[in-house]
Amino acid sequence: MILERVEIVGFRGINRLSLMLEQNNVLIGENAWGKSSLLDALTLLLSPELDLYHFVREDFWFPPGDIKGREHHLHIILTFRETQPGRHRVRRYRALEACWSPCEDDFHRIFYRLEGECGADGSVMTLRSFLNSDGQPLPVENINDQVRHLVRLMPVLRLRDARFMRRIRNGTVPNVPDVEVTARQLDFLARELATRPQNLTDGQIRQGLSAMVQLLEHYFSEQGAGQARHRLMRRRSQNEQRSWRYLDIINRMIDKPGSRSHRVILLGLFSTLLQAKGTLRLHKDARPLLLVEDPETRLHPIMLSVAWQLLNLLPLQRIATTNSGELLSLTPVEHVVRLVRESSRVAAWRLGPGGLSAEDGRRIAFHIRFNRASSLFARCWLLVEGETETWVINELARQCGHHFDAEGIKVIEFAQSGLKPLVKFARRMGIEWHVLVDGDEAGKKYAATVRSLLNNDREEKREHLTALPALDMEHFMYRQGFADVFHRVAQLPPNVPMNTRKIITKAIHRSSKPDLAIEVAMEAGRRGIDAVPPLFRKMFSRVVWLARGRAD
């Protein structure tokens, strides 16, 4: 069973949100998108530690700056789906038989709705119900008992940097039998791994597993509320770097086909660690939903990679939040969700499964995920043909007082990956875009591609396309008053009887296209803003306008 959809109306900082989820998702967005409100909602409503949550007055949304305009109604709908048609009949879910609803796609789902009503006297009422696929309440007896069973089967564990963990005041001393169980599980996993063909000694395996325990109980532990003296792994490895390397090898061993038993042991180890460190007790049938909050806050990128690989081995649904380009480079783009606060809602943008063809997906994975993962945080992409344009455009924008990084604008060259996949991807992810093309034959084809994507809408074309009235960037800048730079680099006198193309070719041979572009951009900087071609100034204003439209 997985949590398939979260719908929130009027809860804390979220006016309206509809979020589809898969087995693993990474959520990104700017600071005000409502991350804390979403994670709080899941943590409070599906917590294994607390009894059923009752809404309070502070849970109701109000318009920013207008606390008197606080809403009096909120509702949250959590949709759970069986992983395969027919799975709802297995023993684990039998107690929830009355809550399942058949759907047209042959899957059964549980629609769990919570409503909050705030009275004029400040009193708050919390209502719970299970719905059918048409949104009508099901005649379920003992709704609260059913909800408790649902939470027992799929509790939320919120894992975050141990520095920010919430201290549990009572029951911080771990139960000794649990500590012994953990030691036995570690020993068994070490013996299991030692029987497999690999190049680690028994001691190295144990050192790697020690790093695993250290990671699970320290770096990703909110439930780990015990004091330092109660930690299971008291002594840190003398050579921590080597331990992480061994853990990386162990991860890869467990990730191989036929290693399901090792994953089960790993899950048991993870569960026992959590229970040994606090008052938390998980049901034997529980398959927790992990909320991993900004895992990069305390991990070096290499360690982050190893830690993320370890979490990938746990057979559990996971929702992570991050501000790290490093983590995004480790995540398939179809698992990334961009959340953007708009005036009336928080919009969730995603590629989703099957969002791109296999070839386009491969191009995006290489061009964006592996080489420019941080561009997924951008508000607007300015797509240019190559490296020359990247150098010139960034520098000229700076001369005009536009700081692209601060505005959330990323200049991305598209010649290597193709224009169409990038535009399609940007649209699916809610990233604004603008294309700059040359005036040569290739540029005209790119312009035609943009127009076809915009259905030849003239107004849209004005917002999304700028075409150079010249063969390429070099010819354009030559005509815009920078001929002397080309002559200087080509080591030619100003009035030499030679056509423009030959002068530019000679200048490129004397340096290179990127170096020539930098020379032109630096000269523009010396001359001031008036030297920046009006075409570019107009384009910069449009791109900044697009970016700000998304940010507001």
Which residues fall in each region the model found?
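Electropositive, glycine-dotted interaction segments
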Residues: 85, 89-188
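Flexible phosphate/Mg2+-sensing switch loops adjacent to catalytic phosphate-binding sites
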Residues: 47-72, 140-143, 275-285, 322, ...
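Activity-critical C-terminal alpha-helical subdomain
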Residues: 445-519
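Conserved P-loop NTP-binding catalytic core
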Residues: 40-106
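RecA-like P-loop NTPase motor core
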Residues: 328-329, 334-442
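Extended helical coiled-coil dimerization/tether regions that scaffold
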Residues: 165, 174-288
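Charge-patterned, long linear interaction tracts outside catalytic cores
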Residues: 238-244, 393, 398, 487-552
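Switch/communication elements of ASCE P-loop NTPase nucleotide-binding domains
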Residues: 1-27, 32-47, 245-371, 448, ...
